[in-house]
A protein has these predicted regions:
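Predominantly a core beta-strand signature of beta-propeller blades
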Residues: 1, 44-47, 86-88
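Glycine- and Gly-Pro-enriched alpha-helical subdomains that act as flexible
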Residues: 13-34, 38, 42
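Short loop/turn segments immediately following the C-termini of beta-strands
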Residues: 26, 36, 73, 135, ...
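Structural signal for beta-propeller blades
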Residues: 29-32, 76-79, 148-151
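Short loop/turn segments immediately following beta-strands, especially the blade-tip
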Residues: 34-41, 83-89, 93-95, 154-164
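Blade-level signature of beta-propeller repeat domains, shared across WD40, Kelch, NHL, RCC1
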Residues: 124-169
Length: 169
């Protein structure tokens, strides 16, 4: 992505019409939308939503209702974000003490790799991506930084088919 003043660009998604690009800013702790002009240039960055303590947006997927699904590796959260920025927590597997320590490090400017690698949880191991799959696109698969498997859960909303499934050259 070619844009200024981005707080560590991570995953991105295009809207269905190809007019907007959504970007997770991990250390900016926000989801930003850019307009895309007819030449493919980005403009008018707008913060769709900001995330609070413990949420460092990483993975990004879109469902058929044009809501965005955000993963956060430090807190093992999956958050569904509506087009107006409203957030719904879908799942979380985190340790409050660890999140408090990470928040102190983040605000003090000393947050580093160790804060991602030492996340404490019951089952999930630093979820970093989400993809919808299965015959009805209602199985949400979770990739992780430290796990040795792929967790999944049934989604109440169907995921949007990836653009490349219907891309013609």
């Amino acid at each position: 992505i070619v844009a200024d003043k981005v707080g560590y660009a991570n995953e991105l998604q295009l809207d269905r019409q190809g007019q907007h690009l959504y970007l997770n800013e991990t250390f900016g702790r926000c989801l930003t939308r850019f307009n895309i002009n007819r030449f493919g240039e980005l403009s008018a960055p707008t913060v769709v939503t900001e995330f609070g303590a413990g949420t460092f947006p990483d993975g990004l997927a879109m469902d058929v209702e044009e809501h965005l699904w955000v993963t956060s590796p430090v807190s093992n959260r999956v958050i569904r974000v509506a087009p107006d920025g409203a957030q719904t927590l879908i799942l979380e597997d985190s340790d409050p003490d660890h999140l408090a320590a990470v928040e102190v490090a983040y605000k003090g400017g000393s947050m580093g790799r160790v804060h991602f690698e030492e996340a404490k949880s019951q089952k999930l191991r630093n979820i970093s991506s989400l993809a919808f799959g299965g015959p009805d696109l209602r199985t949400a698969y979770l990739g992780s930084l430290l796990g040795d498997g792929i967790a999944s859960f049934r989604s109440p909303i169907m995921g949007r088919p990836p653009t490349h499934w219907h891309f013609n050259v």
